[in-house]
Structures are given as structure tokens and as C-alpha cells.
A protein has these predicted regions:
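Intrinsic-disorder/low-complexity linker and hinge segments
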Residues: 1-3, 113-114
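Basic/aromatic-enriched alpha-helical hairpins
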Residues: 2-68
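Residues in well-ordered alpha-helical elements
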Residues: 6, 49, 124-127, 154, ...
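DNA-binding alpha-helical recognition surfaces that contact promoter or target DNA
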Residues: 25, 53, 79, 86, ...
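Alpha-helical scaffold segments in carbohydrate-active enzymes
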Residues: 29-36, 57, 76-79, 83-93, ...
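Hydrophobic/aromatic-lined pockets within catalytic cores
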Residues: 38, 59, 63, 89-96, ...
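Basic, Lys/Arg- and aromatic-enriched nucleic-acid-binding interface segment
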Residues: 71-74, 78-82, 93, 97, ...
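Conserved tyrosine-mediated DNA breakage-rejoining catalytic core shared by Y-recombinases
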Residues: 104-107, 149, 158-178
Length: 178
């Protein structure tokens, strides 16, 4: 098949209508693949060498949206590779390729996931935030919402009205797939 890797991944993203987090993760990986290989690569040409080069690219590339020249966090690199592996596994199951080239890469050559320490706001700090005026009310409300329900920034962005249901007592229930 003459399908490009990024074209195939975009198809998977479009099929992921019920999983907006996966859809946005795939789009993020596609953006990096397009920066790594501006002319693209055919899905059937993706091999161990290409993937090792992409891993090296992820280790060295700078975050686009960040003012500081920061490289991608190792957990972001790990997540991007996990997303790419998912797409390549789909390509195998749909007979676009016969084997997932990611399986040929040793674990020591892949980014390792770090356990991150999280600091949580105290009730006193949250109360202070609630009463602090901020010029962007929508952002303020979204941040406070994430504090009270424990959603990550990317989950808040992916959140849609159809993700909220109500039980028989009228309580709002949030349906998020991570």
C-alpha cells in the first residue's frame, strides 16, 4: 500500500470519535512525525532505524508552545511512543503491515517512564484561589474545575458536554476514558 504513516494515523484519529484524548495524542504525534520527516514516509517503509531516529528526535526536540527552550519531558516521549505503537499495532491488525517494527526496539533504547511527584493544593489554598479575581474567568473556572474533579489539563481540553451524564438523583457524572 502507498499509504503514508501520518495519513494512516490521521485516519485512526478520525475513527477515535469516542476517545478524544487518544485523538489529540495521535494528532500530537503526527505533528512531531511531520517535523521529523517533512516529506513523510510510507507506512510499509517504517522500520527499526526510522523509529530509533524518531526516538532520538523526541529526546532532542524543543517544546513548541513553551517560552523556555525545554525539551519534551521523558513521560511525554514515552506517551508519544506508546501512541505510535498503538497505531502500528492497528496497522498490523488491519493488514497494512505484517509486523510492528516497534517490537524490534530494545527497552533500553526507549524512553523510560518517570514516577512524578505531585503537589496538591490545600483547602486553604483552594479557598484563596476561589476568591482571587483573575482576568480570564473561563480559564479560572476550568482550572478550579480540574482541581475539584482531578482532571488533567489535556482531559479538560478534550471534555465535551456529551461526556457529562446525570444519575437518577440528578448528580452529574463525568465519563472520561484516559
Amino acid at each position: 500500500s502507498n499509504m503514508k504513516l501520518t495519513g494512516y494515523m490521521k485516519l485512526i484519529a478520525e475513527q477515535s470519535v469516542n476517545n478524544r484524548v487518544r485523538k489529540s495524542a495521535i494528532h500530537a504525534v503526527v505533528c512531531h512525525l511531520e517535523r521529523y520527516t517533512p516529506n513523510g514516509i510510507l507506512l510499509r517503509k517504517v522500520d527499526k532505524t526510522y523509529l530509533l531516529g524518531f526516538i532520538d528526535y523526541l529526546k532532542k526536540t524543543k517544546q513548541e508552545h513553551c517560552k523556555k527552550e525545554k525539551t519534551l519531558h521523558v513521560n511525554t516521549q514515552f506517551y508519544y511512543l506508546k501512541t505510535l505503537r498503538y497505531c502500528l499495532n492497528r496497522a498490523v491488525s488491519e493488514d497494512y503491515i505484517t509486523v510492528n517494527p516497534m517490537n524490534k526496539i530494545k527497552n533500553e533504547d526507549k524512553p523510560k517512564r518517570n514516577r512524578t511527584e505531585r503537589d496538591y493544593l490545600t483547602i486553604k489554598e483552594l479557598t484563596r484561589l476561589v476568591h482571587t479575581p483573575f482576568y480570564n474567568t473561563l480559564l479560572r473556572k476550568a482550572f478550579l474545575f480540574s482541581c475539584f474533579c482531578g482532571l488533567r489539563h489535556c482531559d479538560i481540553i478534550a471534555l465535551r458536554w456529551e461526556d457529562i451524564r446525570y444519575d437518577e438523583n440528578g448528580n452529574a457524572l463525568l465519563s472520561i476514558i484516559q
